[in-house]
Amino acid sequence: RGFAETVEVYLLNNLNDTRGFCIDMTGYKTNADVNKALQTHSCYSYQGSVSVDQGFDVSKISNGEFNLPFFNVCMEVENAESSSGLILRGCDKSPKQQFVFEDDGKIKPINDPGLCLTASGDYREGGGGSPVHLIRDLSLLVCDASFSTRQNWGVRSVN
């Protein structure tokens, strides 16, 4: 596997965690579980690097593919309806793995542009970190200005 520059995909609004919330695999770093749904989690970049379970191939995002190269999987819509979760599958360029990353930060499935990748309003504590890491669920909800703090995303590497 060639080296890919990886970036975090993070909520532009930090909400209640100064480290920010990043799209994250369930489980810890290299031991993350590809069979579990994606979530958002305190971003790990404060530790000095992009973590493998939050590291997306920056070159593929512009083509609408959210690829985690360490695990060789892509973000996929679980089912084509509002409140769908986001799962991980082998990358196959199927429409369920194609997203539009709009200039304002909204991430929409190509087949359903009325839905936006959304972090949940409620949160829970994770297993580690000081202060403790926070987790929010990730799903597709109707794009709505009142949810903008939980629907507008950016990408960043570690400077």
Predicted regions, residues:
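Lectin-like carbohydrate-binding module/patch detector with strong preference for beta-trefoil
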Residues: 1-159
